[in-house]
Regions:
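Active-site beta->alpha loop and helix N-cap motifs at the rims of alpha/beta catalytic domains
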Residues: 2-144
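Short, intrinsically disordered, charge-balanced linker/junction segments flanking boundaries
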Residues: 146-148
Length: 148
């Protein structure tokens, strides 16, 4: 896998009036960012309301995004607190040949270094060919990564 370089813009999740994910408009927005010069996008980060989008709608988007001409230019955020759901979602994404992920430690509970390391270790052991960007957003997850 090549090293990620460049600007990866956070994408918005476009919602329908019933608050369901508008898959087509969300993908159009992401592709527009690339057309405008970004090297890639981060889908389902905090700007993309990842914590609020149902897994089934995320999977619907991934199925359609897997056919995009820019497929290899997207980081896929998980936005899930459950380790098992994170791994299962990543396995679905991996089956569609998405390999780059943006993963924040679980939110709400206070975690120490050993618990966060264990969280990422289990993900890597379950999906060894994935490339992970550590999502360092202390305000949202309550954990601050150290340089060690």
């Amino acid at each position: 896998m090549t090293k990620l370089r460049g600007i990866f813009a956070a994408t918005m999740s476009i919602l329908n009036s019933d608050l369901s994910l508008n898959v087509d408009k969300t993908i159009d927005h992401a592709e527009m960012l690339i057309d405008q010069g970004c090297h890639g996008t981060a889908i389902f980060g905090s700007t993309g309301q990842s914590q609020l989008i149902p897994i089934s709608e995320k999977i619907d988007l991934l199925n359609k995004l897997s056919k995009s001409k820019y497929k290899d230019k997207h980081l896929i955020g998980t936005g899930l607190n459950s380790l098992g759901e994170t791994i299962n979602f990543m396995k679905v994404a991996s089956s569609l040949n998405f390999k780059k992920f943006l993963i924040m430690p679980p939110a709400y509970y206070k975690y120490g270094d050993s618990e966060v390391i264990e969280f990422y270790t289990r993900i890597i052991n379950s999906i060894p060919k994935c490339k992970i960007i550590l999502y360092n957003f202390e305000k949202l997850c309550g954990y601050k990564f150290s340089v060690e």
